[in-house]
Amino acid sequence: MHFLMGENSGMLVWQKVRNSAEIVAIHSLPDSWGTGLGHAMLEEALNQIGNQPVFLWAFKENKRARRFYEKHGFRWDGSERVSEFDGALEVRYVKG
């Protein structure tokens, strides 16, 4: 697991999975939304990951997060699953 922290306002966690990488979590406090913190953390993670395919799961109803991922080159691949934590529907985004 690899952890990135964003000035006590956010964090990103990623891990290598076979020949790709998974962004396991990306969170920021609402006060930091729109400040570029999420962009900076995601770009740093992608730089660390290098030239490998990357995937992540997002809550289907979280349109703000989905727009963020799409803005950064991720595309929904059509995969869906039910979250183990709260039963919410998640969709998979991929890049590369």
Question: What are these regions, as identified by a protein language model?
Answer:
Residues 1-33, 39-48:
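Acetyl-CoA-dependent GNAT
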Residues 35, 39, 88-96:
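Accessory recognition modules or surfaces
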Residues 55-58, 75-91:
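Conserved catalytic-core motifs of GNAT/GCN5-like acyltransferases
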Residues 69, 74:
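Conserved active-site tyrosine of GNAT-family acetyltransferases
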